[in-house]
C-alpha cells in the first residue's frame, strides 16, 4: 500500500504524487481510491481504485539513488539497440517499450534515438516526426523520474547523466 504524499511512477503517465486516499462512489459501489496528481500537470487528477490489482501494479516506487546510478551505468554498458528500418515495426517496438515502463529499455531506446538523430543530422536529414514524438514521451517518463529522484528540473537530467558517465571514465 502506498502512502499519501509519496511519489510514484504511474504507467505511461509519469511521476505522480499521491495527494490523498479517499472513498468515492462512482458506480453505485463505494471504493477507496488513490488520488494521483501528475507532477507535470497539477490540474489533472487520476483516480486509481486501491483494490484494482491491474491498475495498482502500474504504480511503482521511484528509483533510489543507488538504483539510479546502476541504471545509468547499465544503460551505458548495454548493447546498443538495433535500429529497425521499417517505420511501422520500429514504431510498434518503441510503443511496447514505452508501455512496459522498463527503465533500462527506456534508457536504451533514448540512446538509440539520440544516436540515430546524430546520424541523420550528419546526413543533413531529420528524424521522422513519430520518432521525435516517441523520444519526447520516453524522456518525459525517464527524465521525469530521474528529476524527481534528484530534485532537479527534467531539462537538467541529460547533463547529469553525461556528468555521471564522464566521472566513470
Can you name each region flagged by the protein language model?
Residues 1-56:
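A positional/architectural concept
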Residues 53-169:
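Charge/polar-rich, low-complexity and marginally structured segments
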Amino acid at each position: 500500500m502506498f502512502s499519501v504524499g509519496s511519489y510514484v511512477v504511474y504507467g505511461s503517465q509519469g511521476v505522480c504524487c499521491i495527494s490523498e486516499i479517499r472513498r468515492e462512489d462512482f458506480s453505485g459501489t463505494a471504493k477507496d481510491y488513490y488520488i494521483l496528481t501528475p507532477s507535470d500537470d497539477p490540474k489533472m487528477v487520476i483516480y486509481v481504485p486501491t483494490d484494482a490489482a491491474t491498475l495498482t501494479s502500474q504504480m511503482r516506487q521511484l528509483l533510489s539513488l543507488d538504483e539510479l546510478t546502476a541504471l545509468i551505468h547499465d544503460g551505458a554498458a548495454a548493447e546498443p539497440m538495433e535500429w529497425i528500418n521499417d517505420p511501422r515495426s520500429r514504431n510498434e517496438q518503441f510503443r511496447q517499450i514505452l508501455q512496459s515502463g522498463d527503465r533500462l529499455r527506456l534508457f536504451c531506446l533514448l540512446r538509440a534515438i539520440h544516436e540515430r538523430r546524430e546520424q541523420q543530422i550528419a546526413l543533413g536529414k531529420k528524424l521522422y516526426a513519430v520518432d521525435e514524438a516517441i523520444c519526447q514521451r520516453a524522456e518525459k517518463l525517464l527524465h521525469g523520474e530521474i528529476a524527481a529522484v534528484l530534485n532537479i528540473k527534467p531539462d537538467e537530467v541529460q547533463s547529469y547523466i553525461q556528468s555521471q558517465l564522464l566521472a566513470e571514465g
